[in-house]
Amino acid sequence: MTGCPPPGGLWVRRLAMNEKFAAYAHPEVLVDRAWIEEHLDDPNVRIVESNEDILLYDTGHIPGAVHIDWRRDLQDQTVRDYIREEGFAELCRRNGITESTTVVVYGDKSNWWACYAFWVFTLFAHKNLKVLDGGRDHWVAQDGPLTKEVPSLEPVPYPTPPKRRDAEIRAFFVDTLAHAKAALPLVDVRSPGEFSGEVTHMPEYPQEGVLRGGHIPGAHSCPWKTAANDDDTFKSKEELAKIYEVNL
């Protein structure tokens, strides 16, 4: 019947999830499995999978999801930088994303690279963005539906953004140096080995290495996974507050 709540345990879990989301500064950004399943056939929603392991998508993905490879699609292939304005517009066009499309990202490793994709979309001021809480691994653990069928999409219009929002949301060398000298909070989300200087890059990412080992003076180590539960969902607002209070 229209308007009836989901059955039994699913309804209880969804209420708990909604309460968790409501405590965040931007609860509208997070969605759960029930939300995804309600919007699988929504033409105004594009689900995007972006993983550390770029081969995972082909082994099965959420029905209708497209694949964005963080190395090939989001990074400049010549210089160490993000794609430029026209590259972003072309990425959206070929993946069936318009200016008004709601883009929902998810991926492996507690949404590590999915959130990277989310950030790149923010860099170009795409308005409607969401993250599937728990990402790919949580979806699979919940027996969420998977398919190997790759959606066939016709290109759609997407205007070239007037500029990349570098000044608004990126910190460059001079910004970070001034921040550190002022003893303001700095969080290093890399691996403990990279933070200590034991390694200059994670084995999987030689192209992401640094010239010198160690960390910026005054920075606190708080690896990405610290913000996630064992089931890959994000920790609660209260848990996150404690983590960053200790580290800052």
Task: Name each model-derived stretch.
Residues 20-100, 176-248:
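Positively charged, proline/Ser/Thr-rich regional signature most characteristic
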Residues 18-26, 82-182, 198-199, 214:
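Thiolate-centered catalytic microenvironments shared by cysteine-dependent enzyme domains
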